[in-house]
């Protein structure tokens, strides 16, 4: 078999084997890839950073298990940022199947911080520093209703506590007391937040989404309807980089570790495309 024929007929098992290797090896032996944060992520980071002591931020963890790998690192990065800078944060999910993932992210970050806390003041205390509102159907009800009264929509929190008795909620009544809402989703939920919460109440909306949703959301960012935007694993890695670079928050950076696998996989695919094209042009020249 001639060279160009070999280049054009590489066994698919070889291709899949190489791809399997370049994807799995960096995950087995993880290392962090430093990324340069882009403007959409920097603006979201700044908006969260600018939350004042008299206001809170809302984190909407409305992502499903199918997109957990992409979006959960965003939730963890935002929570680390908020807790490190002592921002008040309300967490919610718009659908019941996403409650477990939101709980997992909160518990992980709270345990990280409290394991290093020296005093009660240093610790993250439920009801004082953060509140998990849980789930209230249908989605349009909390989107519109929280503009008037959060405690009227979420009478009790996820754990059954009366919302209006929690220390943090004494000052946080409606969207006037919220600096920004960060919506993490792989669907069109962030657009609904714009339609119902931003257009009516002027609430700032930031977004974290999957890579395939990015093209749908960039126009909203470009028009200023989205304050900031994290897209896919790269967006999560950029936010992780900002949190560590600005505040020295140490913790496993899952998105930054995954970027190495993505980079190697893309390079391998490009290499195979180049090899196939070289074989094609050699074959055509022989003719």
Predicted regions and their residues:
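Juxtamembrane interface at the cytosolic side of transmembrane helices
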Residues: 7-8, 273-287
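Membrane-proximal low-complexity regions enriched in glycine and acidic/polar residues
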Residues: 127-216
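Short extracytoplasmic
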Residues: 45-73
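Short, aromatic-rich amphipathic segments at membrane interfaces
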Residues: 225-228, 232-263
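Membrane-embedded segments
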Residues: 66-131
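N-terminal membrane topogenic signal
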Residues: 5-15, 261
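Alpha-helical transmembrane signal-anchor/signal-peptide segments
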Residues: 33-50
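Hydrophobic membrane-insertion alpha-helices, especially the h-region
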Residues: 13-28
């Amino acid at each position: 078999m001639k060279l160009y024929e070999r280049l054009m007929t590489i066994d698919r098992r070889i291709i899949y084997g190489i791809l399997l290797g370049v994807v799995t090896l960096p995950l087995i032996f993880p290392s962090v890839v430093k990324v340069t944060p882009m403007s959409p992520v920097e603006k979201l980071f700044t908006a969260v950073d600018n939350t004042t002591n008299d206001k809170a931020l809302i984190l909407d963890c409305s992502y499903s298990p199918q997109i957990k790998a992409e979006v959960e690192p965003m939730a963890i990065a935002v929570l680390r940022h908020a807790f490190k800078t002592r921002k008040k944060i309300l967490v919610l999910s718009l659908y019941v199947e996403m409650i477990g993932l939101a709980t997992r992210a909160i518990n992980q970050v709270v345990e990280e911080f409290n394991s290093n806390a020296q005093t009660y003041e240093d610790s993250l205390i439920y009801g004082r520093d953060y509140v998990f509102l849980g789930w209230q159907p249908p989605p349009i009800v909390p989107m519109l209703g929280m503009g008037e009264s959060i405690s009227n929509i979420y009478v009790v929190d996820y754990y059954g506590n009366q919302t209006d008795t929690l220390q943090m909620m004494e000052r946080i009544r409606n969207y006037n007391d919220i600096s920004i809402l960060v919506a993490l989703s792989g669907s069109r939920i962030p657009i609904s937040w714009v339609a119902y919460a931003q257009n009516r109440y002027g609430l700032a909306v930031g977004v974290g989404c999957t890579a395939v949703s990015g093209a749908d959301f960039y126009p909203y960012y470009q028009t200023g309807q989205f304050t900031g935007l994290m897209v896919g694993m790269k967006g999560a890695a950029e936010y992780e980089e900002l949190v560590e670079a600005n505040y020295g928050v140490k913790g496993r950076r899952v998105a930054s570790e995954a970027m190495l696998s993505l980079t190697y996989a893309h390079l391998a695919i490009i290499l195979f495309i180049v090899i196939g094209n070289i074989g094609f042009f050699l074959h055509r020249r022989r003719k």
